[in-house]
């Protein structure tokens, strides 16, 4: 399993761990990368529209 993808400079490795099948809590993702949080939050109030 690749632990450090080529795009690791775009996001924390923890986000890639989730993509590769390791389940993470949202509370672990959001503080790790504030700039990505609007795209990762799954709250119905803050969810990005499906067409974006």
UniProtKB/Swiss-Prot annotation:
Superkingdom of this protein's organism: Eukaryota
Annotated Pfam families: Crystallin
Keyword field: Eye lens protein
Keyword Protein biosynthesis attached: no
Keyword Coiled coil in annotation: no
InterPro entries: Alpha-crystallin_N
Example of a GO MF term: protein homodimerization activity
Subunit structure: Homodimer. Aggregates with homologous proteins, including alpha-A-crystallin and the small heat shock protein HSPB1, to form large heteromeric complexes.
Function noted in UniProt: May contribute to the transparency and refractive index of the lens.
Protein family (similarity comment): Belongs to the small heat shock protein (HSP20) family.
Protein name: Alpha-crystallin B chain
Organism: Columba livia
